[in-house]
């Protein structure tokens, strides 16, 4: 269970930890709903495979921007407010994708979706910060497990919903789930005070200082980026290839 560390007994309740894990999985799924749906979207929007595949790429670019520029704000401002703001922006962007008349609006909304889907990366330090030393590794592992489950389950869910209901309906459902997550976070997550006393510019400089001072960090970052990039490239192309002969597979 989460430790209090002086912020009240609420952090001792195990349901907060599981709430973080579940909401992390549900929110990170927004990054991957599009991958099994790309071929369906291409046919409806009547665009090329290249333009359709940019949806997945732009979403991931947005996610990288969110990790770099938004996640550090958790040390500067109240994390609960940051999380709720991003949830409501996600609702807007997911609805925009669901109702988009053309590929260009989907690109713009996908960028916003990617930026705002970095929410689970704010949950991870929350679980670590308010854990007793003997429980810290386990609690962080629970949240990470929820995140990875969301990454894997998102493709199964979106493929099935896309085939049965349609790709637009998947994004309507996703927007509804973000509203539900926002309500849960509002009710369950305690208000956490920021720990950094400086300015945003100083916070960003400290990030680049870490990269400069620790060569192993650079190596691990490059390795992780290449590995996950390969993984995403495979999934993005798979929807188109599986829809062709001799497979003729649907999104599910």
Model-identified regions with their sequence ranges:
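Conserved MFS/SLC helix-loop-helix module at the cytosolic interface between two early adjacent transmembrane helices
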Residues: 65-103
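Juxtamembrane intracellular "pre-TM" segments in multi-pass secondary transporters
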Residues: 9, 190-221
């Amino acid at each position: 269970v989460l430790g209090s560390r002086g912020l009240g007994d609420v952090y001792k309740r195990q349901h907060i930890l599981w709430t973080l894990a579940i909401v992390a999985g549900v929110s990170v799924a927004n990054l991957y709903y599009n991958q099994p749906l790309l071929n369906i979207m291409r046919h409806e929007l009547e665009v090329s495979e290249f333009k359709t595949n940019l949806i997945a790429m732009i979403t991931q670019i947005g996610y990288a921007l969110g990790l770099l520029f938004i996640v550090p704000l958790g040390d500067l401002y109240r994390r609960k407010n940051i999380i709720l703001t991003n949830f409501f922006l996600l609702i807007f962007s997911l609805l925009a994708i669901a109702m988009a008349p053309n590929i260009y609006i989907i690109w713009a909304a996908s960028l916003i979706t990617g930026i705002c889907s970095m929410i689970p990366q704010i949950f991870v330090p929350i679980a670590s910060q308010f854990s007793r030393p003997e429980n810290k590794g386990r609690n962080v592992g629970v949240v990470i497990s929820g995140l990875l489950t969301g990454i894997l389950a998102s493709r199964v869910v979106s493929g099935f919903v896309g085939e049965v209901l349609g790709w637009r309906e998947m994004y309507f459902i996703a927007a509804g789930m973000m509203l539900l997550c926002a309500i849960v976070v509002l009710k369950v997550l305690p208000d956490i005070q920021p720990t950094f006393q400086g300015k945003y510019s100083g916070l960003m400089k400290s990030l680049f200082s870490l990269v400069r001072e620790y060569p192993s960090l650079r190596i691990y970052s490059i390795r992780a980026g290449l590995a996950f990039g390969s993984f995403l490239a495979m999934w993005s192309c798979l929807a188109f290839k599986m829809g062709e002969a001799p497979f003729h597979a649907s999104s599910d």
